[in-house]
């Protein structure tokens, strides 16, 4: 990656709340990650799938030691370093897969520290998601959709869904809830297998329904890109988790 390309990606991350790196997961690691993920998904209980109907699945990467290889993959560190984060701290990770015929993912943001002033003033992400896509992903099978810039500015969806992480929204108790609706400003983020999408945890995002008969799988890994720069209260809270 050239310095100009890296700078462009960083500016997009700061401005829009996300950026994309194409074809950065090598074919062998992609294949093995898909195999392990499929095994875990095949073993998932029907109860789990019903509870996570909107998300699809939410399986911790701690369920299989293989994922240590993906977490430590040079491609992840290199992408974060290119964005100006040479010393990130890993937090958690999940296998998130929308089965064929599953509904949209609800609109939400994933940051929790809104009682800290820096949550509103920081230009760079305090927490970032790294989404590794294992299959080609389009609007037909559940690609990511985002509301650009909502990591730094308010949107009506913040009021519509002040607390999106509820059991009712995950299970799609009310399919007509505003959390699932398309938004005029939404931007689709279609990707190819092996692509990496990096985003700010404060960004409002969701995913389209999977209208195909095949599962759509992404491995979402969470990092603190600039751990040493976080405020003491936030680091203290995270150290307890």
Per-region residue spans from a language model:
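Non-heme Fe(II)-dependent double-stranded beta-helix
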Residues: 1-15, 21-122, 233-234, 240
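Short, solvent-exposed loop/turn segments at secondary-structure junctions
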Residues: 26-27, 95-100, 112, 137-139, ...
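Short Gly/aromatic-enriched secondary-structure transition segments
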Residues: 34-37, 146-148, 213
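Non-heme Fe(II)/2-oxoglutarate
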Residues: 43-49, 53, 157, 193-198, ...
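Active-site rim elements
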Residues: 64-69, 181-187, 206-208
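Generic beta-strand structural signal
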Residues: 86-93, 103, 126-132, 142, ...
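Short, conserved beta-strand element in jelly-roll/cupin
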Residues: 117-139, 190-193, 198, 222-226
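Double-stranded beta-helix
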Residues: 137-203, 228, 240
């Amino acid at each position: 990656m050239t310095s100009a390309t890296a700078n462009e990606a960083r500016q997009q991350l700061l401005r829009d709340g996300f950026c994309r790196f194409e074809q950065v997961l090598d074919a062998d690691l992609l294949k093995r990650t898909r195999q392990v993920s499929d095994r875990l998904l095949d073993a998932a209980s029907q109860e789990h799938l019903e509870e996570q109907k909107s998300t699809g699945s939410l399986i911790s990467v701690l369920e299989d030691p293989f994922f240590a290889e993906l977490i430590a993959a040079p491609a992840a560190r290199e992408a974060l370093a290119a964005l100006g984060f040479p010393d990130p701290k890993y937090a958690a990770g999940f296998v998130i897969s929308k089965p064929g015929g599953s509904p949209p993912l609800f609109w939400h943001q994933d940051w929790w520290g809104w009682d800290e002033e820096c949550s509103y003033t920081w230009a760079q992400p305090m927490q970032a998601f790294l989404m590794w896509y294992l299959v080609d992903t389009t609007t037909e099978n559940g690609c990511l959709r985002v509301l650009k810039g909502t990591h730094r500015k308010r949107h009506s969806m913040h009021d519509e869904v002040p607390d999106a992480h509820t059991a009712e929204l995950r299970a799609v108790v009310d399919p007509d809830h505003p959390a699932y609706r398309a938004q005029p400003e939404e931007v689709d983020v279609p990707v190819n297998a092996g692509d990496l999408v990096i985003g700010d945890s404060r960004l409002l995002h969701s995913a389209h329904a999977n209208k195909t008969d095949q599962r759509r799988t992404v491995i979402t890994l969470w990092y603190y890109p600039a751990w040493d720069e976080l405020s003491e209260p936030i680091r203290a809270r995270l150290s307890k988790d």
